[in-house]
Amino acid sequence: NPSKYTESYGFAGTSGLVHLEGQYLIPRDHPSKTLFLFMHPTTTLQLLPMPTALAAAGLHVLCAASRYPKNDAGLIMENVAVDMGAWIRDAREKRGYEKVVLVGWSGGGSLSLFYGAQHESPTVRTTPAGDPVDLTAAKLPPVDGIIFIAAHLSRAETLEVFTPAVVGCVRMLM
């Protein structure tokens, strides 16, 4: 029963709003219409070397957090997909990016793959526990590519197969 479910993460409470935090790494004097979005289900990534190296090379980077920062126990992956969609929507509609590329580092790889699958053909209406998270109604915005860095299977075992077709795709996105 959805009326019995109240989101308590992301400072949501009964307000119906979820608070998300992130850090844009935007180099000066390097305009871009492409954003590289790093997101992990339960941690932030701005202190890792790759986001800062990409920004230093002139690329626009967002290190986005979900509503579960540093909280693996409370994680609901379906909600994290909704959070990722909110970041993508913000990047396109409010910040003017034409292309958004997901960069899946570690658990972000399985998150990016899950997001990509659900945006293209949404099937999830509830969590395995029966919590109401309807991705078929979430209107997840599209992405223009996915890059995997040290991605792994994840707890949910969502990342099972790689295809060699991904080699060289980054050149097409730039």
Predicted feature locations:
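Active-site glycine-rich loops that stabilize anionic/oxyanionic intermediates
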Residues: K33, F38-L45
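Hydrophobic beta-strand anchors of alpha/beta hydrolase catalytic cores
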Residues: F36-F38, V61, I146
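Catalytic nucleophile-loop/oxyanion-hole region of alpha/beta-hydrolase
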Residues: R67-V101, S121
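Solvent-exposed loop/turn segments at secondary-structure junctions
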Residues: T42-L45, Y68-K70, G107-G109, L153-R155
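Primarily recognizes the serine-hydrolase "nucleophile elbow" in alpha/beta-hydrolase
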Residues: D90-E93, K99-L173
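N-terminal cap/lid segment of alpha/beta-hydrolase-fold proteins
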Residues: N1-T34
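Conserved alpha/beta-hydrolase
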Residues: P51-A73
